[in-house]
């Protein structure tokens, strides 16, 4: 919580800058944040602008555009499961297709089968016609029971699937605010279980990729509401990655092959927070020619959500590179 308080203090003390230097730093001003938010809401109506309590409002943002929110976003798998990491099974368990575990066993003891067979033959002698009729009746009975059992097994499996999905289901409210200290968007998550009960922070951490859990995730009080605990996700190299994307666009322009929107989507699809311009570290400046076609500032949040998707792989919010 100390880290959360220090972060809030830093946000409060950092002066607001209204100058636009998106093309050189990858950072955005409050006005550009609003512009990017309008574009996100236009492309994906599940995201909406919202106001904040009077004492929590930021005067550098419009009263009705304090933050962006999307509610009840589904998450069916934890990050560990989504990334394909499996736990060991017990000795009595058998893993089936699609991750299901079969824990019961069928008793195929030969001695028991022999006893049952001898018991059937100890009942005395009957005539051949009675034996034939009895065998036919048994065959019909077996066929009927097999059909009924098959139907029951299918129903049980469907119920098992539904029960398992409901037990794993979580819902998230996602908030995007403007960070004055980093001059980039900042994401907050507030989660609920399948019964609508708020998740503990340690439970929400289960939905964050292990690569970022200890680096970019922090327990904080939601800054746009009172007494609401959240997990904040801030890719601290976000502005540097944006510069990487613009560097790709500039290089494409120099090769007389302007970076159109399709190329840009392909470039971002293969990038993550660890990518950088060859031969440069993230801390170094990247020279970008002015007026080079590439990412527009109103598309900023689409790229931002692309990054967040790698941090929270199991949360299914609306974003797509087609919006570029």
From Swiss-Prot:
The keyword Transport applies. Residues 100-134 are annotated as: Disordered. Residues 82-166 are annotated as: Flexible region. Keywords: Autophagy, Cytoplasm, Protein transport, Transport, Ubl conjugation pathway. One of its GO terms (biological process) is autophagosome assembly. InterPro entries: Atg3/Atg10. The active site is at residue 236. GO terms for molecular function: Atg8-family ligase activity. Residues 240-299 are annotated as: Handle region. Gene3D superfamilies: 3.30.1460.50. It is found in: Cytoplasm. The keyword Repeat does not apply. One of its GO terms (cellular component) is mitochondrion. The N-terminal region is involved in phosphatidylethanolamine-binding and is required for ATG8-PE conjugation. The flexible region (FR) is required for ATG7-binding. Monomer. Interacts with ATG8 through an intermediate thioester bond through the C-terminal Gly of ATG8. Also interacts with the 40 amino acid C-terminal region of the E1-like ATG7 enzyme. Also interacts with the ATG12-ATG5 conjugate. E2 conjugating enzyme required for the cytoplasm to vacuole transport (Cvt) and autophagy. Required for selective autophagic degradation of the nucleus (nucleophagy) as well as for mitophagy which contributes to regulate mitochondrial quantity and quality by eliminating the mitochondria to a basal level to fulfill cellular energy requirements and preventing excess ROS production. Responsible for the E2-like covalent binding of phosphatidylethanolamine to the C-terminal Gly of ATG8. Belongs to the ATG3 family. This is Autophagy-related protein 3. The gene is ATG3.
